[in-house]
Amino acid sequence: MSSKIGIYKKDKIFINLIYFLILLLPFSLVTGPFIPDLSITIIALTFIYLSIKNNLRDFYTSNYSKFFLIFYLVLNLTSFFSHDPIQSLKISLVYFRYFIFALAVWYLIKVKPGILLSLLKSIIICMLILILDGFYQFYFGENILGWERIGTRVSSFFRDELILGSYLSRIFPIFFSLCILNFKYFFNKKFYLFLIFLLLSSIEVLTFLSGERAAFFYINLSAIFLIIMMKDFKLLRFFSLSFALILIFTITSINSIYKERIIDQTIKQMGSQEQTFIFSQEHTNHYISAFKMFTNNKVTGIGPRMF
């Protein structure tokens, strides 16, 4: 234990760099791919330096590391023998940084366990900003920076990139997992419990208002899984989902345009008297193509970015 404290004091600047970059990730993801990719690269390089300096070999000899290295080797071999090796290797070779990033997070949890609670707070603040700005844009037609809503679809700080729903639906599992890991801090206090309830409901409604049908499907699918499989939190998710659906029903009753895009158009695209589709004809064609590629390359696949 004393050796870990010694390492932390000796390398405080580098550990704090990793710490703050991880806390800023929820915000940097809103800006686009460049800043989060740069952050992950800096975190990975910093951890490599700490690994060499402090001989952190245990992290690299774990079962997780061995599994990843096998996966990484197979991934690059697949890229090498793919239809366009150069294009595929551009993706598979740099994938290694995500492995180092995961090890850096693992290391940080060991030397600074409070990172999990701090990351949860960071995600909550980021989601609150997006949610408040999103509802502001929905009501007034523009967000607090004056960026106008695109048609009826809410995008908040993503501007003309209509991915607000995708962001919320994909960060939600991390958010809820961290809530469970910090159970004593959040679920034993009524204010935080109410805050989580509002966040869950707001994420559902705002994903609907973003007009992203796939994201809305994911968020509802995760809600159903949580309600069915969770023991301690199913009532919280059930009531937050019910409240969100009531709000969505109210919104669609006032403005039927939202219902037409998310519900009516989806039902229309899923099938007609002649042919039935999975979500839409475009989705179905993607699934058929993916299945054919799988049947032709069952063991290795066709390589990253070769779809």
PLM-predicted stretches and their roles:
Residues 42-46, 282-297:
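Extracytoplasmic loop-helix module adjacent to an early transmembrane segment
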Residues 37, 96-97, 274-287, 298-307:
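Extracytoplasmic catalytic/substrate-binding loops of multi-pass membrane glycan-assembly enzymes
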Residues 145-151, 266-280, 305-307:
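Interfacial juxtamembrane loops and adjacent helix segments
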Residues 87-94, 150-155:
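Non-cytosolic membrane-interface motifs at loop->transmembrane helix junctions
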Residues 1-90, 107-121, 178-194, 235-239:
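Transmembrane signal-anchor hairpin modules in multi-pass inner-membrane enzymes, especially those
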Residues 117, 209-210, 230-275, 288-296, ...:
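A membrane-periplasm/extracellular boundary helix in multi-pass inner-membrane enzymes
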